[in-house]
């Protein structure tokens, strides 16, 4: 499965406008992951945005347009979700999700290497 290159460009452009971020792109999760300061922040998977966010905000995030739980092998991953294209069409919604992920990235633990 490929990924939406226009969405990847949109994320790349947005992140480039934020100072003091170390950004690395990696092919992961059958898409393109944006690592911020050494930690997974967001991913483009197919046409969807995959978000990593503070699990305590799940109820708020789940109310947003385009929200889909991230389920792998029958398990719901708390603090991760997919957002369909309709949920990030407007810039205000796109920025909400990217900023949500960036905020969590500040306190998220890096995975073991």
Model-predicted segments: where are they?
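Charge-dense, helix-prone N-terminal extensions
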Residues: 1-113
């Amino acid at each position: 499965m490929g990924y939406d290159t226009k969405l990847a460009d949109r994320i790349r452009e947005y992140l480039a406008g934020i100072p003091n971020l170390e950004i690395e792109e990696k092919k992961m999760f059958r898409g393109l992951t944006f690592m911020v300061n050494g930690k997974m922040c967001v991913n483009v998977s197919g046409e969807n945005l995959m978000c990593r966010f503070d699990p305590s905000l799940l109820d708020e995030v789940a109310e947003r347009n385009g929200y889909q739980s991230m389920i792998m092998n029958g398990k719901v991953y708390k603090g991760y979700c997919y957002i369909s294209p309709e949920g990030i069409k407007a810039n205000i919604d796109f920025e909400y999700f990217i900023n949500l992920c960036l905020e969590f990235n500040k306190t998220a633990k890096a995975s073991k290497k």
